[in-house]
Amino acid sequence: HMGEQARKETYLANDDVIDGWEFTATLDGKTSITCASLDGNKYPLNTGPLPKLHWNCRSVAVPKVNPEYDLGSEIIGERASINGPVAANRTYGGWLKDQNKSVRIEVLGEERAKLFDSGKLSIGKFTDKSGKIYTLPELKKLNPQLLHHSSTLRFQ
């Protein structure tokens, strides 16, 4: 937590060069639904849910350089994942789609994994903007289109 606060203060002290930050989660099966849903979201300075969001959180806030000072971010680098390097612009949701079903169930739980696999909900829809995880009944209420598929899903 102290490290993230120090990063935040550094970003704010350099707001002429840094104009925001990106939430970056670890690409593996141990990442929380909260962090997975926020991965790749970009925020202006001093806004958004700043990591560390929970005990043992491994997510980080990556600074985004003001375009005036940007010297090469158009070059797509790599990002670490449990399966080896992936493109730096790969989000957790994109990574999770490529994993086997057991990993998706481990991360999301059985019912959320069904929703994710069906394409009815993206990973970002499992939480609110602050990262609070919606319960299954809340998901059903917030997403009326799920009512048509509720025969195969348990919303209790």
Describe every region a protein language model picked out:
Residues 1-54, 63-156:
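Domain-core detector
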